[in-house]
Amino acid sequence: MRLRPPNTSRLLTSALVGALTSGLAGCEPPDTRIPQQLERPVPLSVLPAAVSPPLAVLPPAPETNPDKVALGNQLFHDTRLSGDGTVSCASCHALDNGGTDSPLKTSVGIGGAVGPINAPTVFNAHWQIKQFWDGRADTLEAQAAGPVENPSEMGAKWEDVITRLKGVPEYVAAFQKAYGGEPTKDHATHAIAEYERTLATPGRFDRFGAGEVAALSDEEREGLALFTKIGCTSCHAGPLLGGQSFEKMGTVREYFKRRGGEVTDADKGRFNVTKAPADMHKFKVPTLRNVALTAPYFHDGYAETLERAVELMAHHQLGRTLTPDETKKIVAFLKALSGENLDAHVKAIQKPPAAVAAAPAEGEPAEEGAVKPAEAATP
């Protein structure tokens, strides 16, 4: 079934949307009262799959070049992009793990270096307003370039990486086929970005939005109604249910005092990019697609479970204390946002070509960063 683009889709009947979101008009505080009818199981007739903004179904993945995608697929999974041949893009963004390195609170890079921030999912990244929690990369290409030279992530230099790739005949041929030239940093980052553009994960929520009412259970639809009613969609909107704005961590109630510990540079968020005081502690709102697979949550990995994340967000961002039943229903809805094609993405992974570095001349040391065949790719 072909999914309709978001500007033509509707998520709830207009009458229900009006009832559930009236408290959001003019940026007023969300109504903390839940309509009595939402306390009961919701029959199919109450929530027909006629859905409306601010939520939307996932649009089709953009058109891509198959040769560039195949090359990017291999590069994404190749540890030769790191300084010591041990870390790949997939090390922190594993497709069989929600596109993250769950359950790590923050990523671990080259030499066991512990990074300062939680790894966001790579799935559906194409539709995000910017890349990274602080939005420092405008494009997927810029995002792909950064970790390679980050000393706590992949710890390499692009010049050395390209030299390494030029020593692999299969890569030389693949770059020639895809780009009509030899390996370069621009070609490599574009290929990785082209691959990432294919990592869309439509699921049951999209089938619901396209008209298949029974794609969501009664409890999941009750959770959706609550999610909308209490104001979650003021930030988690659009086809990704997030990824389109930057919001302060602790909009209504202070977050960092509750968390405790030192406030780090990573905690400054968007401020690190813009240096604007108004951006202090602001972060890109994360997508909620596949959120059930990406624990722990928040930029610092503070919330260990999805239930705890929902409770903390309601408290700090909306000024609301949820009942256990409300939390349960919202979590049920969030679990329905997992993609139905995740296994297909995993099966489509292409292992990088194995190659042995050229043997050094007698008496000369081996090339720094050279890798053995078994080290060429992540499992």
Give the positions of each predicted feature.
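Periplasmic c-type cytochrome electron-transfer domains
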Residues: 2-5, 10-12, 23-379
